Amino acid sequence: MADFPTYADRFRFVELKREDGILEVRIHNEGGPAIWTAGIGGIHAELGDAFYEIARDPGTHVVVLTGTGDTFLTEVDTAGVGAMDSQTWFRIFKEGKDLIQNLLDIEVPVIGAVNGPAWVHAELLTLSDIVVASERATFADKAHAPGGVVPGDGVHVWWEMLLGPNRARHFLFTGSEIGAAEGQRLGFVAEVTPHDKTLERAWEIAHELRSKPPLMLRYSRSAMTQNIKRRMLDDLGFGLMLEGMGVLSLMGR
């Protein structure tokens, strides 16, 4: 078990705020929009660690995941990764599995509040049970195939489940964007809100859920994510292995 005060202020890139059992998880970079980095101690490791603690905390009953400012995540900083070799990729491989698996191990409802463009790790939001998106939000995977990297860190599994195999492959190969309204039409966005009302609406839904029996929430989340967890268990490690081999080949190793 985890106790919120023991980890609430532990993370540099993840701001945690809890009120009445509702936990807001906000990713950021020095108080501004988050920048994704897989360097040692970067958000790639921190967010998975945060999900691990949240999953072990019986005091949290609903989670709201969001970004900072007008952007969820659009930038990647590769400078901090350092020399890419087998040991570095072993670390990234482990962190990549933890990121997805620890998120899915959270046994309370997760609401994704999409505050703007989500072009990097948009799957973290769309894996939420309820996705509330700003009218300005767009979803894409621009950090993999468009940059010569294999999309193997779970996006190859989840976007296929959301969009179907052909649409997902087009989405991942091209880095094309899907707007909030189109996401709602396709079924992975629940509600589209005015830009300045997204987080507020997510909290409204969180309060509605919070009023329901806690064990019902936990057991429902577990039932609804079991098939996703099974697919990730089967295919996430394989995808990460191929992604690592591709990265090393790009570097001539």
Residue ranges and their predicted role:
Residues 1-66:
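Conserved CoA-thioester-binding segment of acyl-CoA-metabolizing enzymes
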Residues 132-137, 189-236:
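C-terminal long alpha-helix characteristic of the crotonase
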Residues 110, 117, 131-132, 192:
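Short, well-ordered beta-strand core segments
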Residues 31, 39-41, 59, 66-98, ...:
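Glycine- (often His-adjacent) and acidic-residue-rich active-site loop
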Residues 113-118, 172-176:
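Glycine-rich beta-to-alpha transition loops that act as phosphate-gripper elements at the mouths
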Residues 25, 65, 124-126, 183, ...:
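Hydrophobic/aromatic residues within transmembrane alpha-helices
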Residues 129-130, 170, 174-176, 182, ...:
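Well-ordered beta-strand positions
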Residues 99, 103, 118-171, 205:
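CoA-thioester-processing core
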